């Protein structure tokens, strides 16, 4: 791909700055500007949108987002070695790129972006799932983001879109499908990255729902689902007994069989259970309905 921003190819950039991916930070650099541009386009129309990017590394996706017309990109990078590279991109797009040398897990990210907001990221593998759960469980409806376009390990992506009855169905599927409409929109082989990881990767696009598919409180639902799948081979009455002494009665009240296992329960069933558990699990600020 011929760069339209006047900056060198990414392989030249990392060579000039002596950059190499660090396993401790979960880094795998995506250096093909054709691929980073495609991921940016998968996020949809970016004009008049502020974008949060986590883990930009040498800035390939950052360049794609800006080239696609993002109103503003806030790039959160924990690795100080990448800051000089990102500063070069910032100089090409004055006023449109803000780089934060910070840990995304400790950041109040929404304060730095104006609505509408989208999150687009090649997430570091070691924090991707934790960040996703945080983005999926704010107290507000709709969430502070319009969409998420995120790269994960392929097995994580498959867990996000999994359906009841499958071995990959669990917490990520329930929270993702309660808050959004998630779809796998792109796959990438290991050789697309430097260094190549041992697994395939996939991009998942989440379109935020204006209201939950079924009424439930985010914190209560998260607790119930975590307990149920924490011992997924056990019957619900055993897996959830630590939440309430009368758990069998509550399961029946939610329309569930106490002898079912977590992987058999659809999203609607978990939301019904969360509602009947609100008096024993401290809810978040106000019930989400």
UniProtKB/Swiss-Prot annotation:
GO terms for molecular function: 16S rRNA (adenine(1518)-N(6)/adenine(1519)-N(6))-dimethyltransferase activity; RNA binding. Pfam families: RrnaAD. The keyword Glycoprotein does not apply. Keywords: Cytoplasm, Methyltransferase, RNA-binding, rRNA processing, S-adenosyl-L-methionine, Transferase. It is an enzyme of class 2 (transferase). Its EC number is 2.1.1.182. It catalyses: adenosine(1518)/adenosine(1519) in 16S rRNA + 4 S-adenosyl-L-methionine = N(6)-dimethyladenosine(1518)/N(6)-dimethyladenosine(1519) in 16S rRNA + 4 S-adenosyl-L-homocysteine + 4 H(+). It is found in: Cytoplasm. Its main location: cytoplasm. S-adenosyl-L-methionine binds at residues 28, 30, 55, 77, 103, 122. GO terms for cellular component: cytosol. PROSITE patterns: RRNA_A_DIMETH, SAM_RNA_A_N6_MT. It comes from the Bacteria. Belongs to the class I-like SAM-binding methyltransferase superfamily. rRNA adenine N(6)-methyltransferase family. RsmA subfamily. HAMAP family: 16SrRNA_methyltr_A. Specifically dimethylates two adjacent adenosines (A1518 and A1519) in the loop of a conserved hairpin near the 3'-end of 16S rRNA in the 30S particle. May play a critical role in biogenesis of 30S subunits. This is Ribosomal RNA small subunit methyltransferase A. It comes from Jannaschia sp. (strain CCS1).
């Amino acid at each position: 791909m011929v760069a339209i921003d006047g900056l060198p190819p990414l392989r030249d950039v990392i060579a000039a700055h002596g950059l190499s991916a660090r396993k401790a930070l979960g880094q795998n650099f995506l250096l093909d500007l054709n691929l980073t541009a495609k991921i940016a386009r998968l996020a949809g129309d970016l004009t008049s949108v502020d974008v949060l990017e986590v883990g930009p590394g040498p800035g390939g996706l950052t360049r794609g987002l800006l080239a696609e017309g993002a109103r503003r990109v806030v790039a959160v990078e924990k690795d100080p070695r990448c800051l000089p590279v990102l500063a070069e991109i910032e100089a090409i797009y004055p006023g449109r790129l803000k780089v934060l040398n910070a840990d995304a897990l400790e950041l109040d990210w929404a304060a730095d972006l104006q609505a509408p907001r989208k999150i687009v990221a090649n997430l570091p593998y070691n924090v991707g799932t934790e960040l996703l759960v945080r983005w999926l469980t704010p107290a507000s409806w709709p969430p502070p983001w319009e969409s998420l376009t995120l790269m994960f390990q392929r097995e994580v992506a498959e867990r996000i879109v999994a359906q009841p009855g499958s071995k990959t169905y669990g917490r990520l599927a329930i929270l993702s499908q309660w808050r959004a409409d998630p779809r796998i929109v792109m796959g990438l082989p290991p050789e697309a990255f430097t260094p190549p990881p041992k697994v395939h990767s996939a991009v998942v696009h989440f379109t935020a729902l204006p209201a939950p598919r079924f009424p439930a409180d985010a914190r209560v639902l998260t607790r119930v689902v975590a307990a149920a799948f924490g011992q997924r081979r056990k019957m619900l009455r055993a897996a959830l007994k630590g939440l309430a002494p009368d758990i069998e009665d509550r399961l029946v009240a939610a329309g569930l069989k106490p002898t079912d296992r977590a992987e058999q329960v659809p999203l609607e069933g978990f939301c019904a259970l969360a509602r009947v558990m609100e008096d024993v699990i401290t809810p978040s600020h106000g019930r989400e309905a």
